[in-house]
Amino acid sequence: MKKWIIFCLSALLALSLAACGGKETGAAWTEDSLQAFLDSGAFSEELEELDADILWPLYRLEDAGLSREQLDSARAFRSAGATCEEVAVLSFTDEKAAELAADALKDYTAAQIDANRSYRPDEIPKLENARIDRRGSTLLLLVAADQDAAAQLLK
């Protein structure tokens, strides 16, 4: 009986420690990731590439407390105006900067919902289902028409 109790307590301890391990965040988002989303059929139209210098004010990253030097690289594709679809991958100098940027992207998405509620109401579900995913010091912003196609790449 004593051995059984020790075994059960050991198993419980092992399970507790495994639970503390946290969720694996996966590999960093890259330009290859971005291209995979573009090729996935998740968008209802062909998206146009935005200049990286446009992304800084568009996403209001400075308002989030970031400096331009903290953004290592950025690449984004966006609808020319017919839809609210877009995909962006941003890479920062550290995880804290990426956390701040994730908050800025949440604010950006909320502002897009407000701005498009009466103008393009059919786009609101896409914006409400927008994905902002941080992996280390990289971020993905995804506003897609086909969430199922996009979900396959988010795994």
Residue ranges of model-derived segments:
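Second-shell loop/turn segments in exported
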Residues: 76, 86-94, 138-143
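Positively charged n-region of N-terminal signal peptides that target proteins for export
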Residues: 1-4
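A short, solvent-exposed beta-edge/loop patch
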Residues: 122-155
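Short, conserved charged micro-motifs
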Residues: 95-103, 148-152
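Bacterial signal peptide processing site
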Residues: 21-24
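Short, compositionally biased low-complexity segments enriched in polar/charged residues
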Residues: 48-85, 96, 100, 127-130
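C-terminal motif of bacterial Sec signal peptides marking the signal peptidase cleavage site
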Residues: 15-19
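Short Gly/Thr-rich strand-loop-strand
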Residues: 98-135
